[in-house]
């Protein structure tokens, strides 16, 4: 089964908790704090495996949860960091944040990695909070929660050549005779319902990857037929091979087929209009094909190369392969993925950090309570052990140092009013 789009849920591992402990040894009075830090939670990492050709593995498992870091231990022993969860994907996979539609990673090279959900930092043990004023702190920090998000995976096949055209024009037959690919071939429309890849070698030992895409019809760019599902795979081909049934056996005019398919390509992605193209006039073994070819050439002019072939008698197949290889040589220095990134703003950094941690907002609930939200304050809330009075006092100091107390006063918050953070309720005290 060919799967090229899927949505999955990711949960990176939480950091391990720091602990509150003290050094207790014979003959060592006032041993001091000895609580170790928690280990780092596992991140969710995507890695390219060139042996994969589909996203099928993600069809049956949609939820991925990475391991939690180990808790700290006494004697200042740190917890063990969790091992990252590595998910293998085929080359050409684009990862997007479902909520924002932001491109998080574009993975094209074997072994390339991207950290998509970052594991939480381990909480600090009480020995990390020792100061001259408080040499034996009696609180520690909980581990930071790992990132959690839904992402979509979209596969754009990395082929040098893309075969496009109406259904039943001979695309699958051509791929089957020039490579070892075994696409399904039948005398009915949409026999091909998934892309097929084949490695093609020319008689002079040049090679390239060719993709046979499901047949397009008018309106494909708007979702008609199967075309819209698979047009994305054309985006990364360096050369488009446009196959046309020159016999007109389906009752369509060859020149109209040519115009309709090009209109659909341009409507889907404007850049495809300028992609190098070779026209293949197929079924030249049938009556009327030569007359139609002459009229076709008169109509489109000499700018677009037209190569007459027959996939049944295999006439001119070698000439076609030479023409494709020559065209690829001509455009070998063109990086389609870079062109695409510049066009749509794809970001290929390994990890995109969340900006501006210190900002916060204050709003009011219907019952009059003040609601404080923001990355930094919510992170501190999650990492605070509210069963520990010293930890609660530290949290209050952090709120003051961030300016949240002053901001609440400016909004009219008075002594005894309710303040909420992530569902937790506090009483404002002057």
Curated annotation (Swiss-Prot):
Function summary: An essential GTPase which binds GTP, GDP and possibly (p)ppGpp with moderate affinity, with high nucleotide exchange rates and a fairly low GTP hydrolysis rate. Plays a role in control of the cell cycle, stress response, ribosome biogenesis and in those bacteria that undergo differentiation, in morphogenesis control.
Domain OBG-type G: 159-329
Annotated OCT domain residues: 352-430
Domain of life: Bacteria
Keywords, ordered alphabetically: Cytoplasm, GTP-binding, Hydrolase, Magnesium, Metal-binding, Nucleotide-binding
UniProt KW Lipid metabolism keyword: no
Cellular location(s): Cytoplasm
Residues involved in Mg(2+) binding: 172, 192
Chain segments carrying region Disordered: 118-145
Limits of the Obg domain: 1-158
Class in the EC hierarchy, top level: hydrolase
Record-listed E.C. numbers: 3.6.5.-
NCBIfam families: Obg_CgtA, Obg_CgtA_exten, PRK12296.1, PRK12297.1, PRK12299.1
Cofactor: Mg(2+)
Chief location: cytoplasm
Binding site for GTP: 165-172, 190-194, 212-215, 282-285, 310-312
Gene Ontology BP, a term: ribosome biogenesis
Quaternary structure note: Monomer.
PROSITE patterns associated with the record: G_OBG, GTP1_OBG, OBG, OCT
Lineage of the species this protein comes from: Bacteria, Bacillati, Bacillota, Bacilli, Bacillales
GO (cellular component) term, any one: cytoplasm
Protein name according to UniProt: GTPase Obg
Family classification: Belongs to the TRAFAC class OBG-HflX-like GTPase superfamily. OBG GTPase family.
GO molecular function: GTP binding; GTPase activity; magnesium ion binding
